[in-house]
């Protein structure tokens, strides 16, 4: 496919020389949105797939044969970004009966449409739950958390680009998603200080310090390595927020 061969042609070639094709299940989509899928005749029932515009859903070892149609319907009708739509498909699969063996694991990977050559930044979401009684519930939690971290990272980048207002919008968006995450509140406060907005930072520091004194211990260390101003008056005001 990297050389331009379509997904259907690639799958056809692979299956033609695969002696175990009857027990395979595979789906692929190329950069032009051409979709190909295969469910082997000897895959353990219930097994099957549905392809549509820019997507494929497939399943095997399901409780019943309504699972993948439910996935397709959910994916095509769900609102939101790609991650939201994929989660909707997974939720629908479970609601329709899911894996006959029960619930154990779930994963979600979303990459950018235009690779930059930096795999670590091209992966928008790379989440997995390897063993849980409620894997989809945990995956939902991780997705929200990762969205918040993505906002924090965007805020840090905005700070580097001297876009303070943009940074604060990103930090606020992160806080709205995970309001109880003390680390995000703390680094938001640190960013405010470095923008010269010490007064705005103090309520955030106060909240963090009162919840966990370790952040109070950490704060002078940041000043020593240049991540907070070395001005003792400023540092004193920050530390006093713990009172």
Question: Positions of the model-derived regions?
Answer:
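Alpha/propeptide regions of enzymes that mature by internal proteolysis
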Residues: 1-101, 108, 130-161, 176
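Residue-level recognition of tetratricopeptide repeat
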Residues: 156-157, 190, 224
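Canonical tetratricopeptide repeat
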Residues: 153, 187, 221-222
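Short coil turns that delineate tetratricopeptide repeat
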Residues: 179, 210-214
């Amino acid at each position: 496919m990297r050389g331009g061969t379509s997904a259907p042609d690639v799958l056809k070639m692979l299956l033609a020389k695969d002696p175990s094709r009857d027990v395979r299940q595979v789906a692929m989509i190329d950069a032009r949105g051409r979709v190909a899928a295969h469910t082997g005749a000897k895959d353990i029932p219930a097994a099957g797939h549905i392809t549509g515009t820019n997507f494929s859903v497939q399943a095997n070892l399901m409780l019943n044969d309504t699972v993948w149609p439910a996935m397709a319907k959910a994916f095509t009708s769900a609102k939101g970004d790609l991650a939201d739509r994929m989660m909707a498909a997974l939720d629908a699969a479970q609601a329709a009966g899911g894996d006959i063996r029960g619930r154990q694991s779930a994963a979600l990977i979303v990459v950018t449409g235009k690779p930059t050559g930096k795999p670590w930044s091209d992966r928008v979401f790379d989440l997995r739950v390897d063993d849980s009684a409620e894997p989809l519930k945990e995956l939902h939690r991780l997705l929200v958390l990762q969205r918040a971290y993505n906002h924090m990272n965007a805020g840090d980048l905005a700070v580097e680009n001297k876009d303070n207002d943009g940074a604060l919008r990103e930090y606020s968006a992160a806080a709205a998603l995970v309001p109880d995450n003390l680390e995000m509140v703390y680094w938001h406060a640190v960013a405010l200080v470095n923008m010269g907005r010490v007064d705005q930072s103090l309520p955030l520091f106060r909240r963090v310090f009162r919840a966990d004194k370790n952040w109070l211990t950490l704060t002078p260390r940041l000043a020593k390595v240049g991540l907070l101003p070395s001005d003792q008056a400023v540092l004193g005001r920050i530390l006093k927020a713990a009172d």
